[in-house]
Amino acid sequence: MNSLEKAVWRSRYLSRKTKVRIFGSLVMPVLLYSCEAWTLTGGLKRRLSTFVCNSLRKIFRIRWQDHVSNQRVLEMAGMSCVTCQIRLRQLRTYGHVLRCPSTDPARRILRAGEPRGWRRPAGRPRKRWLEQLEENLVNVRVTGLAAARTYAERSAEVWKAKVDAAKRLPGACPHT
């Protein structure tokens, strides 16, 4: 990341638009690699958001004294927040997995519960991927996994339209 900062972000020869496009095409795919399988915790959300906003602040040469909000920085870059991008990717992946045959390993993992004889550790249970997915479905205006299953199994186009509509809903992303 330091080499990008020295060679690209500080460059006076590249426009800010070009720098944002480089950020979106080189940094974001690496940052979000396999994010479809993550369970987002509060700490992970904060660290991802901090990294993205700090990088964009370097691109736009915004100092901390300028008092520019993270929302404004994302608007300047024409990006949505990282957690919302991850949520949409997870929803797309869920629809894809539901359309797989029932013998597919990914589909079987979704149906599998806890192994027999296994006990959960003491303390507050960690959030599971399916529990997080149920929360994400609220943003798509789908109530419950059963309703999501019917939409996703109908066709890829129906599910894609439902997920894409979630991007445009007001309040779909509470962070922006």
Show the residue positions of the predicted features.
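Short linear motifs embedded in intrinsically disordered, charge-biased segments
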Residues: 1-176
